[in-house]
C-alpha cells in the first residue's frame, strides 16, 4: 500500500456584496444570501475556494502537478470548453476523473476561513453533498471546519487529503 498526503490552499480578497446579481460559490454551492463577492477580475469569478483547494491537494498528493492547471487551457490535460465560469461546478468532478484510475481518496480535511457575518451552517450539508457526489466518497470521509479569518477582507480554504494508490488487479 502506498499512501500520499496532499495540501491545497486558496485565498481571495472579498468585498461586501452590493448587487443581488453577483454569485458567490463555496464548495459547489451558490450562497444565495451571501454578504460578499470575490474582489477580483470577473473572468476569474469561477473561484470557489473549497473546490480549488481540494483539487490542488489531490493533484499534489497524486504528484500530477498544480491544481491550477484546471483553469489554464494552455497547460491542462483536462480540456475546458467555453467559459471557465460555467466549468467551476465541475472542478472536483474533473479532478476525480483524472485521478480515479490509480488513487483512492481516504479522507479530506477542510478548513474554511470566512468572516462570521456570513453564516455557513445552513450550507454545510449541501457542501458535503456536492463534494461527496463529485468525488464519489461518503460524508465520513470529509471533515469541514469554518472559522474566522485573520483578515476580514479575505476568504481562504486549506485542504489536506490522504490518498491511497489502488492495486492493479
UniProtKB/Swiss-Prot annotation:
One of its GO terms (molecular function) is 2-C-methyl-D-erythritol 2,4-cyclodiphosphate synthase activity. InterPro entries: MECDP_synthase (IPR003526), MECDP_synthase_sf (IPR036571). It comes from the Bacteria. One of its GO terms (biological process) is terpenoid biosynthetic process. It holds the Pfam family YgbB. Signal peptide: none annotated. SUPFAM superfamilies: IpsF-like (SSF69765). This is Uncharacterized protein MG459 homolog. It comes from Mycoplasma pneumoniae (strain ATCC 29342 / M129 / Subtype 1) (Mycoplasmoides pneumoniae).
Amino acid at each position: 500500500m502506498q499512501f500520499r498526503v496532499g495540501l491545497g490552499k486558496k485565498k481571495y480578497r472579498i468585498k461586501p456584496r452590493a448587487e443581488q446579481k453577483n454569485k458567490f460559490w463555496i464548495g459547489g454551492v451558490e450562497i444565495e444570501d451571501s454578504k460578499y463577492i470575490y474582489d477580483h477580475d470577473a473572468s476569474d469569478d469561477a473561484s470557489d475556494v473549497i473546490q480549488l483547494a481540494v483539487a490542488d491537494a489531490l493533484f499534489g498528493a497524486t504528484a500530477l502537478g498544480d491544481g491550477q492547471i484546471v483553469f489554464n487551457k494552455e497547460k491542462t490535460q483536462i480540456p475546458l470548453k467555453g467559459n471557465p465560469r460555467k466549468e467551476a461546478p465541475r472542478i472536483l468532478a474533473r479532478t476525480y476523473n483524472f485521478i480515479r484510475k490509480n488513487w483512492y481518496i481516504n479522507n479530506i480535511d477542510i478548513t474554511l476561513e470566512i468572516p462570521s457575518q456570513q453564516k455557513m451552517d445552513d450550507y454545510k450539508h449541501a457542501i458535503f453533498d456536492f463534494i461527496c457526489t463529485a468525488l464519489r466518497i461518503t460524508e465520513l470521509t470529509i471533515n469541514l471546519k469554518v472559522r474566522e479569518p485573520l483578515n476580514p477582507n479575505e476568504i481562504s480554504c486549506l485542504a489536506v487529503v490522504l490518498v491511497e494508490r489502488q492495486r492493479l488487479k
